[in-house]
Curated annotation (Swiss-Prot):
Keywords: Cell membrane, Lipoprotein, Membrane, Palmitate, Signal. This is Uncharacterized lipoprotein MG309 homolog. It is found in: Cell membrane. Pfam families: DUF3713 (PF12506). It comes from Mycoplasma pneumoniae (strain ATCC 29342 / M129 / Subtype 1) (Mycoplasmoides pneumoniae). Residues 436-448 have a biased composition (Gly residues). A lipid is attached at C28 (S-diacylglycerol cysteine). It is a lipid-anchor. Its main location: membrane. Disulfide bonds: none annotated. A lipid is attached at C28 (N-palmitoyl cysteine). Residues 379-402, 430-464 are annotated as: Disordered. Residues 449-464 have a biased composition (Low complexity).
Amino acid sequence: MHTFTRKVKWPFMFTAIGLTFGIVAVACAQPTASTVEGLFKPSSAFADRTDFSLSSILQKSLINRESFNQYLAMRLAPVLRTFYEDNYDTDIKERLNGFTADTDNAFVSQEQNLRNQFRENYLVHLQTDIFDNTGGNQAAWKLRDVNNKIIDDFISRIFAKNFVEYVQDGVGPLTKPTKSLIENTSNFKNIKLQPKFVNKNAKLKINNDAVYAAIQDKLLDQFITNENPNLVSRVVFTNETPVDGFDNYFNTKVIQSPTPSYQFQVFNKYNQQSGGTKGANGFNLLASNLKSYKNDQSKGIDIPNKFSSDSGGKLLLKASDMFDTFDPSFSAAFIQGYLALQKKSKGADSKEVDSLIKDKSIIENFFVDNNTQAAAAARAASSSSEGTIQLKTASDGGGTTQSTVHKTDLVKIFGDKDVFAGEYKQQIGNTNANQTGGGGSGGGGGTSTGSSTGSSTETTTGNSSKAVVDLIEVKKDSSSQPDYILSRGKDGIHLMAVDGGSHYLTESGRDVAKQKKFLLFRALQTKYGLVDTDTTYDFKLFDEVKKYFDTNRILFLFEALLDLSSDTNNKDNFLSYPQFKKFADSIKSIEKDLKELVQAHYKQAVFNETAVAENKVTLKLAERNQPFIDNERNNQIEQNGLAAKLPYEQDAKTGHYNDLGNYYKDIIDNVDKKGTSTVKTTSSNTGQTKNFSEEVVSKLKDNKKKVEEAAKKHVEALKVFTIPSPLYSQVILVQTKLSFTPESTSLGLNLALNNYLTSTELQNSIKLSYFQEDEAFKKIIDITNLTFSQQSGGTGGTNGNNNLTADNWKIFKETYLLDLFESQAQKSIFGHVGSSDKNSSTKTGIEGVLDTLYSSLNLEERLDSDDVIDYLSYLYTAHWLLKDNLKNYKQSLQSKLSRTSNAFLVWSVDSEKNKNDSQSTLSSTASSTSNTGLIQLRSVVSLAQNQAAGQGGDNNSDITQTEVKNPNFVFGSSVYDWTNSKTPEVNRAADDTSSFFYTKSSSSSTGAAQSSATVLRSLNQASGMTTKTAKNRYGFRGIVTSSTSGSLPEAVSRRLFKQFVNQTEKGVKVGGQMLITTAKSGKATLVLKQQADDAESTTNNAYKGALFSFGSMDNLKNIINGIQTQTEFDALYNHLTSDLNIDVTGVDKNKTLTEQKTSLTSFVDSNFKQSTQSAQRGDTSARSARSATVQIKKTQEDNQNTNYKDVFSRFDGYIGDNKVEEKNYTSYQFLSDGGKYHATFVKQVNLDDVEKIGTDSLKQEDSSKDKRLNLSLEEFLAAIALEALDPNNQTQAINALISGNKKGLVKVGDFRIFSSISAQWVRRF
């Protein structure tokens, strides 16, 4: 090994001798003491925990994809080196010497840069910055650099030539095959990747091409199997501006200035006289000759480019990127055609070629019968959902199968919006016709009309009404499978076909070998120019193979070499050439060592990438639908025009499109066959075929175990040991002597370690160990399976959680998932809130969606992921808040709550209903006169009877206790039902998905609506109403203070903290105008009066709770007395007068601070003295003493303190335009804000409530409610669950977790670990 001083070149020294002497002087200098002392001293162990042993860390390194690729590259390079060392091409052989020279020069340059930068300390930095990361010393650095150069050069040679040829038996590759010869499926077997000039028995440099061609062939196999590439022959007819004007198709008074687009898709009519090959005339010619475009010999389909508005030709659609590259409607339409050839397609309308409409406008093919007798009969027979019809389609056995056709009924969707005109009105029907059950109001944005399940086909406009479809399968005749797809897209109408699909796609599946041969046939055609001029296309097959290969080139190349080595069917590949014996032997040697591990990694990589690709289907289709949903949300549904749903059905539970997933299932099933004789595709417990999303998860889990087992076996076989660290080194280095090339193998292991030890996976393993070592936390959750113990917690001692059950802890899990769900851009990809089959155990409601979200995270298989650490950090924070009799939760609240500002437990949701305009309550009836008394009475009695029957209308049902299954189109439109999965009815205005957060309340003591009026309660009781079970309350926001109210709608926040008492409420006088009396018969009569003494129906709650935060008058006075500055006084004074609207009198701001305080105290004494006496009213005794007849009492006399009598009392109830207690919901008026209506329920809390939290707070008994903020246990835990999401609480909890670890901080012995993770988690040995 040369030292650095010998690297200086003599010419350089002679021309710059002064500089050279300086360098020598620096080289001889010793590093500074401070630099050396600051170095990390490596240990013999990575960390002082069991899972951080040498064997364990090496195994994890070889399981990690990136680390394994680092290792694999160093194992691959020595194999490829043998190809260079004995090569008969001198240029290739000399490349090795060039690589070595280039590496030596690169090292000299790098060394010089470090000298110039760090002077006397450069040797330290050479070791720590360079060598420590690349194997430990100069030799390892150079070996790595040369190895990488070998790999890069070899790969560049693989794809340098196009080797596809027609190989005639007994002749070899033809110079140029004929068109007729290759266009025959029986000759496809002769199309191969083979060099034209090779001689197996001679040692020639041209024989290198045999190596490149053979590897190309194996990489092509990978590409075909893993990407499922299909050529699509296609033409497009782009959207047109109609010559007769858009106003002959769309009502331009409703849709102003329509332009050519998908929504306003128009095509000019066929004109026999005009000629031409574009537009309608071109479609006429194309459709008339469609049967002739399929070549019965080659099975290829070539559509003349002249018909296309663009250049036409063919496109290669691949699994990994087609939904990123193309319009998702186009990609999905291709899959529909792919599946149709396998007899697996569903949902689309079907036409025979001869029935295509050719002599009118192209788009008329997409207007289909909407209400024919056949469709109605099919619906009745199949009990199909609205928006679908059942058609008979032929099957192989001569029988018939039912196929649901999804179509869009625009007549019903647009309701009274007159969207269409002229031609389209004639076809589609009159959208503003007076229909039975049809049509929402124009201002309603197309709300559902009689059905919330989808776009119904049932209208009363007669058989002339047409529905719209987006895709049509086109087949030659009734007995054949569809060869073509006619589909609508953003740019126009596409006619497409899977080129050659009928050759390799059958009912039994995809024949990968035939698919490969067909694509080679097309590649051969383009190579030799054997394509007809009118159907030319651009197809560079091996550019696509190279593009795929580059995504994981080390693993894919290694897998290709192993496949060649084990390919017993091909005796003529390069491995049998005498001149490549050394190369072949090296492949064989490494095959035994690495095959199991490489193939396990290979499958895992493909399964992962395919799962990612399939997820894009759901995401991209959701993005496709989103603009149309937004139009509906924004009351601009007419802007959707002709937009129609696609024919694919989304699984409401999982969010996946299972039918489209069959395309991806063809990939993983074929990959799984590698190395096995059979492939399992059915569920072991049901015997039913699994869909893709289920199967890929199963395969990933099973194969992950194979990767782990193979890595463990491989590490054990290598007998790896640590070696002394070089001078100045800060890392642990390893070595093995048991391998084909021990130097490169040892280097590979060190590179794998270098990558893994700085990875997030390693950091998370350290963090995970803290959770695993916390004994109290382990009693709550099984960290391996992430499941809760049935009895989670101790006895309430130091670490106990008062025996919370697993069900209690699920509240925390669901809260975490709801928070995560809210952050998702496309929430519909996780399914939606719907009803399950009555015989199914599937969860309904938001819980089902959260289950899908949780399953998608696959946490149990990713314990070293950020997702798991985030989840465990949250759960530990909840545990930390609960432990020690909720000491930390109590302290957290005490730091947030203040005596001088109110705090609330808040439930707030939005409503699409303006309840304020349509009240049928006592409060609205009370102002009427006696002349309308009978009408008023009937209205009240009817309302009471509805409530007694549990049938209260939207305006009278507590929407905070109503599950909103689709707030503001989160899961799509129920009118369109874009996903054909019965999207729940939309609650339009509720666009804040926090409405999904809910709590379980205690059992209620009265009926569903819990009316505030005596008569309504009496009627409910007379109707046999019984005590109801606990109901959920939605829109839970936890404890909200003025400083944490940002998550609330602005209007709600302002009402709570700036307008708790508003001007309108201040003007309300106590009293009413009517009284309702019930006789024993149950009949009601109306009695007028001046004042009623029934406080429950007429109490003015304006100031109730205004000063609840202070707790009592004494506390308020003490705070006033304790004020030290004018600023403090002004803050309190402004809070009372501005925020709470209290008319404070007698305070002169021009006087001294002491005088102002005295005046304010006097005002408190004068006005609030009754507060403590009126804080609790005897509601229960009043109700029990009340007779069936409400008696008229004298008007109460006003007194100056009446408004303030409950000022220190707790307010629990609804707050909006007015404030009413919980029992008085029917008189509640929503808070309006910009066209939205907020329903908000609150419970006040103060520091006195917080002080009571402690020993008995987590007991189930209601007697403990006053020790948990007057909440049920479920509500209380939900409040704590939200507090556990607080980043500040999480920081404190994790600090406690770390400081409380009995083993102390994790000791680490490698600088790479120490520097990659926060110092709070680790320390040096």
